[in-house]
Each structure stands twice: as structure tokens, then as C-alpha cells.
């Protein structure tokens, strides 16, 4: 099990409160298998993996925003394609 120093991760993010929000968002992605971990899992829980990624500077609030925006765009495109497909099939 990897050891995570919360203070080092907080220093990367800026403060403990933003660290909690960022780590929770990332851990949720990992838990739902929406994204692959950027560090070896080493049988760690998603929260520990998220903190390790933050500590190494691989994830921050800005990166999380970009990932979520990209996911929303991809979802929108997929929905539009599905609507177009159904319209073609029915009409």
C-alpha cells in the first residue's frame, strides 16, 4: 500500500478544501471506471489512487474540469448521433 501525505497533495492543489473536492471527483471517476488510473493501482482504493495522482501533479481542478467538459461533449455528440439514426430509421 502506498503512503500518501495529504499535506503534499494539498500543496499541489492550493488548500485542503479544494483538495477534498478534487480528490472526491477523481475518486468517483475511478470508482465508476469512467477513467483509467494514471498511477499503478497497487490494490489501493480509489480515494488513495486519486490522492497519489494529485500528489504527483497528474490531476488538479483544471484538469478535472477539462476531462468533464470533454465527457459532456462526447455525450452530446453520441446523443445527437442516436437521434439522427432514429430519425433516419423512422422516416
Curated annotation (Swiss-Prot):
SMART domains: RNA_pol_Rpb6. The keyword Nucleotidyltransferase applies. Its EC number is 2.7.7.6. Transmembrane segments: none annotated. The keyword Transcription applies. InterPro entries: DNA-dir_RNA_pol_omega, Pol_omega/Rpo6/RPB6, RPB6/omega-like_sf. One of its GO terms (molecular function) is DNA binding. One of its GO terms (cellular component) is DNA-directed RNA polymerase complex. It comes from the Bacteria. GO terms for biological process: DNA-templated transcription. Keywords: DNA-directed RNA polymerase, Nucleotidyltransferase, Transcription, Transferase. It catalyses: RNA(n) + a ribonucleoside 5'-triphosphate = RNA(n+1) + diphosphate. Pfam families: RNA_pol_Rpb6. The RNAP catalytic core consists of 2 alpha, 1 beta, 1 beta' and 1 omega subunit. When a sigma factor is associated with the core the holoenzyme is formed, which can initiate transcription. Belongs to the RNA polymerase subunit omega family. Promotes RNA polymerase assembly. Latches the N- and C-terminal regions of the beta' subunit thereby facilitating its interaction with the beta and alpha subunits. This is DNA-directed RNA polymerase subunit omega. The gene is rpoZ.
Amino acid at each position: 500500500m502506498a503512503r500518501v501525505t495529504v499535506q503534499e497533495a494539498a500543496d499541489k492543489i492550493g488548500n485542503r478544501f479544494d483538495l477534498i473536492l478534487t480528490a472526491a471527483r477523481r475518486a468517483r471517476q475511478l470508482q465508476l471506471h469512467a477513467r483509467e488510473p494514471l498511477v499503478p493501482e497497487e490494490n489501493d482504493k480509489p480515494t488513495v489512487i486519486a490522492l497519489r495522482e494529485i500528489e504527483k501533479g497528474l490531476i488538479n481542478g483544471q484538469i478535472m474540469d477539462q476531462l468533464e467538459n470533454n465527457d459532456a461533449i462526447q455525450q452530446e455528440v453520441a446523443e445527437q448521433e442516436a437521434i439522427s439514426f432514429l430519425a433516419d430509421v423512422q422516416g
